[in-house]
Swiss-Prot record:
It comes from Salmonella phage P22 (Bacteriophage P22). Modulates the activity of the host recBCD nuclease. And thus protects linear double-stranded DNA from exonuclease degradation. Gene3D superfamilies: Winged helix-like DNA-binding domain superfamily/Winged helix DNA-binding domain. InterPro entries: WH-like_DNA-bd_sf. This is Anti-RecBCD protein 1.
Length: 94
């Protein structure tokens, strides 16, 4: 097996912050290599959705009212387009 030149910092930057298949792709690995390295480094690979902060809610609403699309807001906030859509819907119901 060839040596995988992935640093601990690179793995820590993606483990638990995105779905494993997307994290592996981001690092240029296949899924088996990703899990192998994560296990060797004792890193958790489970993706946990980050909670929305009040600041993010305010920023999202400001961006939307300024004319940004949900897709652009998602990119700016580092969220999925679907999560922005869902969060906007929840906030409008309050």
């Amino acid at each position: 097996m060839r040596r995988l030149n992935i640093t601990t910092a690179e793995m820590e930057s993606v483990c638990g912050r995105m779905v494993a298949c997307r994290a592996a792709e981001h690092l240029g690995l296949n899924i088996n290599q990703f899990y192998y390295i994560a296990k060797k480094l004792s890193l958790k690979t489970a993706f946990i959705k980050p909670r929305w902060s009040d600041d993010e809610d305010k920023r999202m609403q400001t961006l939307i009212s300024s004319g940004y699309t949900q897709r652009n807001v998602a990119k700016i906030l580092g969220r999925s387009e679907e999560s922005v859509k869902s969060r906007l819907s929840r906030l409008r119901k309050k």
